[in-house]
Structure formats: C-alpha cells, structure tokens
Amino acid sequence: MKKLARLTALLLTGALLLALTACGAAPLAPEQQAKQWLLGEINSYRATLEFAPLEEVKQLSDAEQIWVEQFRAAGKTELPESTTNETHQKWASMTGNWTRCDTFGLGVKKDASGELIDILLAKVPANTPEGKAELSEALNHHAFNLSACTRIGIAVVTIDGQMYWTCSVYS
C-alpha cells in the first residue's frame, strides 16, 4: 500500500511538473514585452543591412533603466538637467568601460531660461502596420546603422499611459 501511495505521489508530481512546463513561464509585463519586440524589430532591420544583431547586455540595460526610472518617478518626459546630474553620473559609471556608438530616445533641449532639459523622445509605437512604419523610420537613426556596434542597453517606461523607450548602442 505504501509503495502504491509513493508511486501515485510521484506520478502526480510528474504530471504537475509537465502541466507547469506546458503552461510556460509567467507572461512578461507590458514594458518587458515592448522591449523584446523593439529589440526584435531592431535586429530584423539590422539583418536587412547584413549587420550582426545587437546583443542586449544586462549592465547596459540596467544603466538605461536608471534614466527611465527617474522619468517614471517624476511622472514626466522632461526633467531639468539640474535634477538628473546624479543619474547621469551613475549611468556614466555603469557604462564607462564600454565604447558608446550612439544613443536613441533621450535628448536635451534648453528651456526659456537657458537651463538644459533632459527629454524622453521616443514613444513605443503600436505593434501594427502603422506602428511598424513609424519604427522603421526611427531605425534610420545613426545608432542602429553602425556595423561595428553589436551591444545594446535598452529600457522602456510608461508615463501617463504612454510607453517610451531609450537605448544606447556600444561596440
């Protein structure tokens, strides 16, 4: 009887593991889905140029995430540079050993008083034909058109219901 109970328990455990495996991993959060979609689209574009795909490097994506988290915390897409200096220093310390080719999605402008303002520029387009056309236009940016650059740090953030993204490309 004990052997039958043990066998039944083993079979049930195996069936449970099989069911969990069949279900797959937990679904990705929308920002993570967008990030994976963007990276796939970038690499599809680079394949048409016969360039190597961009490999995401966790340390570099963590550095990009530092930027977007500051915008998320403020709930804004524009922040005075005086409030982002510490973030920039942290980003620089995380990326300092890498050769940066270019950055996309993060810009700077001057306000009326002459103060520099950091801005999140790139909205994540919808995964529709129109959105893909919009992204295709964005992929003409210098950052994605350098064959020697093969590493990327990328981050996505949602602010007021709109997703934005930024990335830096490295050799």
Model-assigned labels for residue ranges:
Residues 1, 24-25:
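Intrinsically disordered, low-complexity Ser/Thr/Pro-rich tracts
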Residues 1-11:
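Bacterial N-terminal signal peptides that target proteins for export
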Residues 10-13, 53:
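Enrichment for repetitive, rod-forming helical segments
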Residues 13, 47, 69, 73-76, ...:
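Generic surface-pattern signal
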Residues 19-22:
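C-terminal motif of bacterial Sec signal peptides marking the signal peptidase cleavage site
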Residues 26, 30-97, 152:
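Short, well-ordered surface patches within globular domains
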Residues 85-171:
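A well-ordered secondary-structure block
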